């Protein structure tokens, strides 16, 4: 919905597609600063937490992608910020509910985490009376009523097919089904071991200290910051589909925990040196990855470059409402990029060469996309069967040899590129 709004304001473009992701990413940094400053009344912790959040590059990279993980992380952070603020001013519970609803509307059931974190925080801190606070109950009703309104509307419009596709395929099959990945409870731990440096050891030590303060010393703020990443991490680890960007919602908490851990360890001189060093690293890294050929997660390089190179000729040759064949590519990638840049949809993949040949025989005019290596292998085995329309280092766009005379290369009446 927000992407559609950006399209309406700025026109359809890559900038419009990622506009709100970038805006929400900036909002997360601001919220992290405000939350840390509210909890500890110390600008050093707040500023350090904001800088720590920027690295590793997975956060900045995700903030530049048209995906819902950053909006979800923003609403989770906003909801828990409001929950903490409600300790002294109860009307903040209403914003807690509205932000949770935004999380549910952003990424379905994953948006419920603020409710779960708040519930366990109240239980472990024995705030029984607070659990029935009228404003908190109202906030929860707002979260569930507004958040799940989309489910009701979708069910009323699409019926059982919505239930089957959303809950059956998207959630249960992808998350827990037999055909995704072998079950590995440590999958997210492995992702953090690969991607969360240099902060991982400090965050782990900090989590231990925060857990001790929360459960033994009965410090409410420490308990909440401990439950936030721990609960999300444990629940997400029960699924089979482990992708670190799904856990971006815990990055603000880990950044604050790491910053507070440094604050407790360092004297004033070391603190100033750390901040100066972090700020310098931010500037030098940004300069290095964007002014040199070196490629990294945070590099401001052209996204989906290989798809963009083929998008115009795909659109020229494939009529509207006709799908592009998919030989041995994945189900999702590059499906969305093809749809965005060429206005053409990619079929579900087929894996067997025999099936490809059968479909080409039945429909010689059908056009296909495959990995370039796969196409070269096909071409070497059956050089007379296929005609290569265009290829690059990653993808090959091809058809049958019988269709070569019908391939179009005249772009004179077509807008290029289709999407900037």
Model-based region annotation:
Residues 19-40, 78:
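Transmembrane-helix motifs of polytopic, lipid-linked glycan transferases
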Residues 287-402:
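Short periplasmic/luminal acceptor-recognition loop of GT-C membrane glycosyltransferases, typified by
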Residues 262-292:
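Signature aromatic-anchored transmembrane alpha helix within multi-pass, membrane-resident enzymes
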Residues 32-55:
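Transmembrane-helix signature of polytopic, membrane-embedded enzymes
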Residues 38-39, 43, 79-93, 262:
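Membrane-interface transmembrane helices that cradle and orient dolichyl/undecaprenyl
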Residues 9, 86, 98, 102, ...:
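Transmembrane-lumen/periplasm boundary regions of multi-pass, lipid-linked membrane glycan transferases
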Residues 31, 71-88, 99, 254-257:
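Specific aromatic-rich, kink-prone transmembrane helix
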Residues 18-21, 61-71:
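Short acidic/glycine- and proline-prone juxtamembrane loop motifs at membrane-interface regions
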């Amino acid at each position: 919905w927000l992407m559609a709004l950006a399209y309406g304001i700025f026109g359809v473009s890559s900038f419009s597609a990622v506009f709100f992701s970038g805006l929400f990413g900036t909002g997360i940094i601001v919220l992290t600063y405000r939350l840390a400053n509210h909890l500890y009344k110390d600008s050093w912790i707040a500023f350090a937490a904001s800088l720590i959040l920027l690295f590793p590059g997975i956060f900045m990279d995700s903030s530049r992608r048209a995906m819902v993980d950053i909006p979800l992380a923003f609403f989770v952070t906003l909801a828990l910020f409001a929950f903490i603020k409600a300790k002294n001013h109860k009307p903040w519970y209403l914003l807690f509910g509205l932000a949770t609803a935004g999380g549910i509307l952003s990424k379905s059931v994953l948006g419920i985490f603020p409710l779960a974190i708040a519930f366990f925080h109240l239980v472990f801190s024995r705030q029984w009376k607070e659990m029935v606070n009228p404003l908190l109950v109202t906030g929860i009703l707002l979260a569930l009523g507004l958040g799940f309104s989309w489910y009701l509307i979708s069910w009323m419009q699409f019926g059982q097919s919505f239930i089957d596709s959303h809950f059956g395929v998207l959630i249960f099959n992808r998350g827990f089904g037999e055909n995704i990945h072998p079950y590995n409870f440590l999958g997210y731990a492995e992702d953090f071991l690969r991607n969360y440096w240099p902060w991982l050891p400090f965050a782990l030590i900090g989590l231990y200290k925060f857990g001790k303060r929360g459960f033994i010393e009965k410090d409410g703020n420490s308990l909440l910051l401990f439950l936030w990443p721990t609960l999300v991490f444990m629940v997400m680890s029960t699924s089979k589909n482990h992708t670190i960007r799904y856990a971006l919602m815990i990055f603000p908490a880990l950044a604050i925990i790491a910053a507070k851990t440094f604050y407790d360890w360092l004297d004033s001189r070391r603190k100033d040196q750390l901040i100066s060093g972090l700020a310098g690293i931010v500037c030098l890294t940004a300069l290095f990855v964007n002014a040199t050929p070196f490629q990294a997660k945070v590099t401001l390089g052209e996204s989906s470059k290989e798809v963009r190179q083929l998008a115009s000729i795909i659109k020229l040759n494939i009529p509207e409402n006709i799908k592009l064949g998919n030989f041995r590519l994945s189900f999702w990638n590059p499906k969305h990029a093809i749809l965005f840049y060429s206005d053409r949809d990619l079929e579900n993949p087929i894996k067997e060469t025999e099936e490809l040949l059968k479909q080409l025989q039945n429909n010689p005019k059908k056009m296909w996309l495959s990995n370039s290596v796969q196409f070269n292998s096909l071409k070497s085995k059956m050089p007379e069967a296929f005609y290569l329309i265009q290829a690059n280092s990653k993808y090959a766009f091809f058809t049958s040899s019988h269709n070569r005379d019908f391939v179009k290369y005249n772009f004179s009446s077509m807008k290029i590129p289709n999407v900037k």
